[in-house]
Regions:
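Catalytic center-proximal scaffold of phosphoryl-transfer enzymes
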Residues: 1-179
Length: 179
């Protein structure tokens, strides 16, 4: 979003939905979902804005809270402010976008068709692991992919080193993103 001065700022918006409880009595009234938004760079009182919304939904500081996010640093910082039981879940849209970029970079990184096909199979396996909820194995696979890209970068010489180098950096960044 752009303000009047011409600088950029980031808006964080969310919807707080109370969790489902199987053991809740049938006559218990469900709490409605509530929305919140704030501009992180301009709002130094995050706890005064967000925690009352969470508290109105029945949240206590020692309870588990799950945030679905794009994985940006601002949301990761938000987790540390909410409480020790806060957890981040990456949304599939942003994960799939990053995987698509890695696939395209892999196709152009190396003239060796065998290496490229093997890495594309690795990315398909990584995608499968993520889709099926095997986060720890997916992080290991992403780190292995980054190592393979690094190996290709080391073997290349001159101008040919640039594409594997970019692939290695992107793969390493993706592994960090998943952590």
């Amino acid at each position: 979003v752009r303000d009047r001065v011409g600088s950029w700022f980031e808006v964080i918006a969310g919807k707080c939905v109370p969790g489902f409880r199987r053991d809740a009595p049938g006559d218990e009234e469900a709490r409605p979902a509530k929305c919140f938004a704030y501009v992180q760079a301009h709002d130094d009182r995050l706890r005064r804005r967000l925690l009352p919304v969470l508290a109105s939904q029945g949240y206590a500081p020692n309870q588990r809270v799950v945030l679905m996010s794009d994985g940006g640093d601002s949301v990761r910082r938000l987790l540390t402010r909410i409480g020790p039981e806060a957890e981040q879940v990456l949304d599939w849209f942003h994960v799939a976008m990053r995987l698509a970029v890695l696939v395209q970079m892999t196709k152009g990184a190396c003239p060796d068709a065998g290496w490229t096909e093997s890495r594309l199979r690795d990315l398909e396996r990584l995608k499968w692991l993520l889709w099926h909820g095997h986060a720890r194995h997916a992080v290991d696979a992403a780190e292995g992919f980054a190592d393979d890209a690094w190996g290709m970068e080391e073997d290349a010489a001159g101008e040919a080193k640039a594409k594997p180098g970019r692939l290695h950096r992107a793969a390493d960044e993706f592994a960090t993103y998943l952590r």
